[in-house]
């Protein structure tokens, strides 16, 4: 275990004026607080925060960050308090230590929800101070290095979370070495057989090519030296996870991989980068399409380098990366490379890491999505997609560079420029030509967005975008449009309700009733009424507490059934019902054009609907005995579907529109309900008559029949019948199946 003076010396090597007192005090305090605590491995617990601090010294971080690393588990696992740490080390360090503690306190049901909440909390904490990320990643790295002592289930869970969240997040923030080590450690536990196989093959390949790599390294160094370029050349081999991922994604065998080895060339200036590139291309043949200039166009994580691939001495492909030493430091440490902290009299007053980097721009954009209303699991899905995706670089007509994930469309581009441009997008010109909005953008495309003030982003756009920002904005706009429709419906319902009550109505009149309704504003009331969450009579009573509902229904005056205050409801057979607004207990009168039910009985026996909203059956129909559900249709009331209806899949992502409803029937119910049967019958004289006889024998009425397909030996048809309930329908289908004239019969749902 590292001694106190050794830690101070490690920091002094890169920061001679280190605040030794702060480091010594944090070391002693953390060691005393953790005391005799042990890790799962049996090692003293204090060895963990000490190793986390050591990892951060490798990044050349300041003493305040090192102190935070030493203290990061004290509040959670010892008797230490935030107040005590504030007094000893200052409020800034105390705040960050407490923030790291909160990241661990989770009690969620699903693994996915835990990951989502972990990521959400981490990103919000990073937005306040990036040192949270640096300590958290170092903490995760040491835990991964010592993961072998855990049980298998826990190893797998931690490794998967590391691969899904922490490794790509380190990459997004530019910390490539950290990302690679996290990936390799996670790969080892997620797929140990594959890790072992790839590792062994790479070791064999390295041994076989060691001499060749040394020769190329020497050749490159000599070329640069002859031309006056001060350069260092270092060979490198792809990591096992990188090799395995490429094999999996591209369907290649190990033998088919051609760029396992590469070289990194580091020079002093940007000018030397391009001079070195020219020398390389004049010495060896380059592979077309493999040149990338990330110096002129940096990645979103601030990575800068020139990539090229050449045909080497033995005709194999060799990848080269050319960069300055400063670029190499940023590529290795990412945001940590920007953390040049300078003591200004207090360890709690450092220069903050620059927030103007591309990595921070991505972070800010990601955090903005947290306020767009996505649930945590959706946020996790969208952010994980962006963590892993490669990039394309496109331009506005004025030359502004827009970086997008691979697979992005003009809609993503529009939202990347500005949310208002995305919301008003109706078309796009790509390189001067009008292209479909689903077009996948490519590197170098110039995109000009066509706009309209009347545009409302359709929900279908969600399937066309690749960025979380676009998806969140589309979802927000869709919710806003639906809410507007609900508000409009609620307005009409309340106008009628207040008119029935003989009371004046306006939006301003609703304001005094807001406290009684427990609603924040008038629009919230209108939307709640439109959604069916709030009965209109409750609103009237909230505004006029002395109001008494004296509406007349057919229970006490059947003659009123045709007057204002009734809704027309049409079932799938086209029958028109008059349903009162008075609620479930009110009677209903069937339109004279339709079949008349027994006197005093309801025509639509459904419970659970709002009395203020019109109700109708879906076209495929439902019969008593079916499990049913109501779907709120903005501006159209409630539609009743059988639970097995395929049409319900369109509402899977809109749970707020689902209403729990049920049948309300009794033995005296005489209403019939439409159902549809698909029949395949033998094509012979009398077959149709036998089918009609089965329906008649079961007291069912066939009100429509259509031939779907006719062949020499059979006929397929759709029969619409009217039945009392599900048992009645099943009995008819069963007897049809038993008929010698019928080869198959089944109910049609949708």
Swiss-Prot record:
Reactions mediated catalytically: GTP + ATP = guanosine 3'-diphosphate 5'-triphosphate + AMP
Gene Ontology MF terms in the entry: ATP binding; GTP binding; GTP diphosphokinase activity; guanosine-3',5'-bis(diphosphate) 3'-diphosphatase activity; kinase activity
Keywords carried by this UniProt record: ATP-binding, GTP-binding, Kinase, Nucleotide-binding, Transferase
Keyword Transferase listed: yes
EC number assigned by the record: 2.7.6.5
Domain ACT, chain residue ranges per copy: 676-750
Phenotype on disruption: Cells show morphological abnormalities such as branching and swelling forms during vegetative growth. It is unable to persist during stationary phase, presumably because of nutrient limitation occurring during this growth phase. It shows an important growth defect in human HeLa cells and in ovine macrophages MOCL3. At four weeks post infection the number of viable bacteria (deletion mutant) in mouse spleen is markedly reduced compared to the wild-type. The deletion mutant shows very low levels or absence of VirB at all time points of growth.
A biological process term (GO) from this entry: response to starvation
One GO CC term, this protein: plasma membrane
Superkingdom assignment: Bacteria
InterPro entries membership: ACT-like_dom_sf (IPR045865), ACT_dom (IPR002912), Beta-grasp_dom_sf (IPR012675), HD/PDEase_dom (IPR003607), HD_domain (IPR006674), NT_sf (IPR043519), RelA/Spo_fam (IPR004811), RelA/SpoT_AH_RIS (IPR045600)
Chain ranges of the HD domain: 45-144
Domain TGS positions: 390-451
Region (Disordered): 587-613
SUPFAM superfamilies hit by this protein: ACT-like, HD-domain/PDEase-like, Nucleotidyltransferase, TGS-like
Family, similarity comment: Belongs to the RelA/SpoT family.
Function: Functions as a (p)ppGpp synthase. In eubacteria ppGpp (guanosine 3'-diphosphate 5'-diphosphate) is a mediator of the stringent response that coordinates a variety of cellular activities in response to changes in nutritional abundance. It is necessary for persistence in mice, essential for intracellular growth of Brucella and required for expression of the type IV secretion system VirB and therefore plays a role in adaptation of Brucella to its intracellular host environment.
Protein name: GTP pyrophosphokinase rsh
Species this protein is from: Brucella suis biovar 1 (strain 1330)
């Amino acid at each position: 275990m590292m001694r106190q003076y050794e830690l101070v010396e490690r920091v002094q090597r890169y920061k001679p004026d280190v605040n030794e007192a702060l480091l010594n005090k944090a070391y002693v305090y953390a060691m005393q607080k953790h005391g005799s605590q042990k890790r799962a491995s049996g090692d003293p617990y204090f060895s963990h925060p000490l190793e986390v601090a050591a990892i951060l010294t490798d990044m050349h971080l300041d003493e305040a960050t090192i102190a935070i690393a030493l203290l990061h588990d004290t509040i959670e696992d010892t008797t230490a308090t935030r107040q005590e740490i504030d007094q000893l080390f200052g409020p800034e360090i105390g705040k960050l230590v407490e923030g790291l503690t909160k990241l661990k306190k989770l009690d969620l049901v699903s693994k996915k929800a835990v990951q989502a909440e972990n990521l959400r909390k981490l990103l919000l904490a990073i937005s306040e101070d990036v040192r949270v990320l640096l300590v958290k990643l170092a903490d995760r790295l040491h835990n991964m290095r010592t993961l072998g002592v855990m049980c298998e289930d826990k190893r797998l869970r931690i490794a998967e979370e590391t691969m899904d969240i922490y490794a790509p997040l380190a990459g997004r923030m530019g910390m490539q070495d950290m990302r690679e080590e996290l990936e390799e450690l996670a790969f080892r536990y997620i797929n140990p057989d594959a890790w072992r196989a790839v590792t062994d093959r790479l070791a064999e390949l390295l041994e076989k090519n060691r001499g060749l790599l040394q020769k190329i390294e020497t050749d490159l160094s000599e070329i640069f030296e002859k031309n006056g370029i001060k350069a260092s050349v270092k060979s490198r081999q792809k990591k096992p996870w990188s090799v395995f991922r490429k094999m999996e994604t591209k369907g290649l065998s190990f033998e088919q991989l051609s760029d396992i080895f590469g070289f990194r060339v580091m020079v002093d200036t940007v000018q030397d980068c391009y001079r070195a590139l020219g020398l390389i291309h004049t010495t060896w043949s380059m592979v077309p399409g493999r040149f990338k200039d990330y110096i002129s166009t940096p990645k979103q994580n601030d990575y800068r380098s020139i990539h090229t691939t050449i045909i080497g001495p033995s005709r194999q492909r060799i990848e080269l990366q050319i960069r300055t030493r400063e670029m190499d430091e940023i590529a290795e440490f990412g945001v940590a490379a920007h953390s040049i902290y300078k003591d200004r009299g207090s360890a709690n007053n450092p220069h903050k890491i620059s927030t103007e980097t591309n990595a921070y721009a991505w972070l800010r954009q990601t955090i903005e999505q947290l306020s767009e209303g996505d649930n945590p699991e959706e946020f996790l899905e969208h952010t994980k997609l962006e963590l892993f995706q490669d990039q394309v670089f496109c331009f506005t007509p004025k030359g502004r560079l827009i970086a997008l994930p691979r697979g992005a469309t003009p809609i993503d581009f529009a939202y990347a420029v500005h949310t208002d441009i995305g919301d008003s997008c109706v078309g796009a010109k790509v390189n001067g030509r009008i292209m479909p909005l689903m077009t996948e953008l490519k590197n170098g495309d110039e995109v000009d967005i066509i706009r309209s003030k009347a545009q409302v982003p359709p929900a279908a756009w969600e399937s066309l975008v690749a960025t979380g920002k676009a998806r969140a904005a589309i979802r927000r706009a869709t919710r806003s449009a639906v809410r507007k429709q609900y508000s409009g419906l609620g307005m009409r319902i309340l106008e009628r309700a207040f008119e029935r009550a003989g009371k004046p109505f306006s939006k301003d009149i609703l304001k005094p009733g807001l406290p009684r309704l427990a609603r924040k504003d008038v629009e919230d009331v209108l939307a709640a009424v439109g959604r069916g969450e709030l009965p209109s009579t409750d609103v009237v009573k909230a505004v006029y507490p002395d109001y008494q509902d004296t509406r007349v229904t057919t229970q006490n005056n059947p003659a009123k059934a045709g007057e204002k205050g009734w809704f027309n409801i049409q079932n799938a057979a086209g029958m028109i019902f008059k349903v009162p607004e008075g609620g479930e207990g009110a009677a209903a009168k069937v339109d004279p054009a339709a079949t008349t039910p027994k006197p005093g009985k309801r025509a639509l026996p459904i419970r659970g609907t709002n009395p203020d909203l019109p109700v109708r059956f879906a076209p495929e129909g439902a019969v008593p005995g079916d499990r049913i559900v109501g779907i709120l249709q903005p501006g159209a009331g409630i539609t009743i579907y059988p639970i097995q209806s395929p049409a319900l899949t369109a509402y899977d992502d809109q749970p707020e529109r689902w209403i729990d409803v049920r049948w309300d029937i009794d033995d005296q119910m005489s209403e019939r309900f439409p159902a549809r049967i698909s029949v395949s019958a033998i094509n012979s004289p009398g077959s149709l008559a036998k089918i009609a006889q089965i329906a008649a024998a079961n007291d069912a009425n066939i009100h429509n029949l259509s031939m779907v397909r006719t062949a020499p030996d059979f006929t397929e048809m759709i029969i619409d019948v009217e039945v009392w309930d599900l048992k009645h329908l099943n009995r008819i289908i069963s007897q049809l199946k038993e008929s010698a004239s019928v080869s198959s019969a089944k109910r049609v749902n949708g």
